[in-house]
A protein has these predicted regions:
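Terminal-region recognition feature
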Residues: 1-149
Length: 149
């Protein structure tokens, strides 16, 4: 096998660090997705496995453009159910779906140069008026769910 045809390990854009005081730090740095296609997305399944693999308080540093709101909602719920204290620090940007995850922190901190971007949900839809009405109803439900975060 040549060097070019060798599979490369997926590069992950999140990393858990075990701190000396027993707490953990998560660096969440990349797009939020339901499934991993390129190996760089934060997915709920992977997140849950790593969240439950330790204990103690956690600090989450977020720098993410957002992504799949349903995946973000799952991660938000996991963090809300977590037994330890959850602190969020926005490092750069917590945009779109990442802003939902940021709201799971008991304390949320931002520097003066970081950004939190919240917007109305959006989608692409094709079909007749019935399909468009379904899409509108779905967007309204998503909007209400993220407002509740």
């Amino acid at each position: 096998m040549s060097k070019l045809s060798k599979p490369r390990p997926a590069r992950r854009f999140w990393n858990w660090v075990q701190n000396d005081d027993g707490s953990r730090t998560l660096y969440l740095d990349g797009p939020i997705a339901e499934e991993s296609w390129l190996g760089d997305e934060v997915t709920p399944k992977q997140f849950k496995e790593e969240l439950l693999s330790g204990e103690g308080d956690i600090t989450i540093w977020i720098n993410s453009p957002g992504g799949d709101v349903f995946a973000a909602n799952q991660i938000y719920n996991m963090l809300m159910d977590y037994k330890g204290k959850v602190t969020v620090k926005i490092d750069g940007i917590a945009a779109s779906a990442a802003s939902v995850i940021a709201m799971a922190g008991g304390d949320v901190f931002m520097s003066p140069v970081s950004m939190l971007m919240i917007h109305n949900p959006a989608t692409i839809a094709i079909g007749d008026t019935e399909e468009m009405e379904k899409a509108i109803a779905m967007l309204e439900e998503i909007k209400e769910s993220i407002i509740n975060a």
